[in-house]
Amino acid sequence: MTIQGADRGGLFIRVIPPEISGGFRFDVLPRDLSHLQLLEGVSECEALSRLRRLFSLCGIAQERIAIKALEAAHGKGENNGCFDEEVFRESLVESLRSLLLPLAGDPLLPMSSTASWQRLGLLGKKQNSNFLSDFRFFLEEDLLGEDPAIFLKRQTVQEWRHWLRNNKEKSPVAHRAEAFDSEGDIFLPRMSGLTLSDRRCADFVARALDDRTFLSAPHMNGDARETGSLSRIGDHSLVNDLWSAGFSRHARLAARLLELASFSGQDNARPFAEDDLGVLHSCRLGVGVGMAWGQTSRGLLVHRWDVQQGEVQDVRILAPTEWIFSPKGGPFSLWLAALGQRKKDLGSLRRLVVETLWLFDPCAPVGIVEAPSSAG
């Protein structure tokens, strides 16, 4: 995660000073997605080559979903859900990686994490049937500090606190979460989940992708949606108990950990439903226009490609970051709005924003910029 300077495609959080807003306030700026135009005006092969260079995070998912959209554009390969094991594995490894990432200047993570990074690197290269066995071992030794099956049985705030206390010396995630500033536990209302099981979702996204401005600030008829682990596993008792108690940041972290732990009891990739990680969908929207989508580690990823006479005319990509950080009431935007009501110094507020970015897990560089110090 980069918190200094963001290029095209990056995410910017603006700080509005007290003389303008009456107190420090943060908001999310619409994301500049003009870099997607680099995929247009070239052949499909060249566009896919450029796509690989543009997206380093979840690169397999980006490429596979793009290929599915292109196949659908040519009237081939339309389906209501197929499981892609490589996308599934990439999603699990990416979830682990993002949870272990150190924050900028973060003194909290134990220094013994070098071996964890080495094991994670090896896990990301696994291509055999031992993947889930090695994944389970990594969860216990490097992430949770305890058997994932035991972690899955935790149901209450008290049991969560018990895990934090008992494992803060073994788990870098527990170590960081145990030190959460209580000021950051701002109560937020539950948001509707963005799931494929709602059949309206695909139709809505298809219509919404017709509007380029929507890509930078998506919403569903004014109602922004939750995506990622919290929308997929948000009904777990532990998540509900933490949320009901007002610990929204802890609930978000618990959902991410519970989802990972839920895969630990499998000997093979589990039977899939349409909202599972690694399940890809596609459909043809018109002559030369195809759309594909699927659940990745951070949430719903959608591609729409328009190809005419062998040349890519238009590419629209709606990524989880746009849903989560939507200026139009996305989960992170709501949290920032609530944070702005707190009377703290700018340094403390910045630290809290950086700390919470780790939970919301953007898939783009992040820059924090300041608005002019006067209304002029």
Please give the residue ranges for each predicted region.
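Active-site bordering "gate/hinge" segments
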Residues: M1-R298, A319-G376
